[in-house]
Amino acid sequence: MSQIIDTPVDGTLDATGLNCPEPVMMLHQHIRDLPPGGLLKVIATDPSTRRDIPKFCVFLDHELVAQQEEAGTYLYWIRKKLD
C-alpha cells in the first residue's frame, strides 16, 4: 500500500466532512478534469464511500487502484479510464 501513497497523483479531491451524495458528485467532476490515465487521490470521511466509490469506478470503467482506511478517514486512488 505504501507504494500507492508514494506515487505522484494528478489531482486530489478532499471530500472530508461531506456526506452522500456529495463525495461521488465531486468525484465525477474531478475525474472529468483529469487526462486519460490520470491518477486521482480521494480523501473522505463518509463511510458510505466504501460502497459508492468502488461502484462508481465499475460503472464508469475507471480503475480503483487502492483504498485504505485510517481512523475514520477513507483514502482512494482512482485511475481515469483511457478514452
Curated annotation (Swiss-Prot):
The keyword Cytoplasm applies. It comes from the Bacteria. The lineage of its organism: Bacteria, Pseudomonadati, Pseudomonadota, Gammaproteobacteria, Pseudomonadales. Its main location: cytoplasm. Pfam families: TusA (PF01206). Sulfur carrier protein which probably makes part of a sulfur-relay system. CDD domains: SirA. GO terms for cellular component: cytoplasm. It is found in: Cytoplasm. Belongs to the sulfur carrier protein TusA family. The active site is at C20. One of its GO terms (molecular function) is sulfur carrier activity. The keyword rRNA-binding does not apply. NCBIfam families: PRK00299.1. This is Sulfur carrier protein TusA. GO terms for biological process: tRNA wobble position uridine thiolation. Keywords: Cytoplasm. Coiled coil: none annotated. It comes from Pseudomonas fluorescens (strain ATCC BAA-477 / NRRL B-23932 / Pf-5).
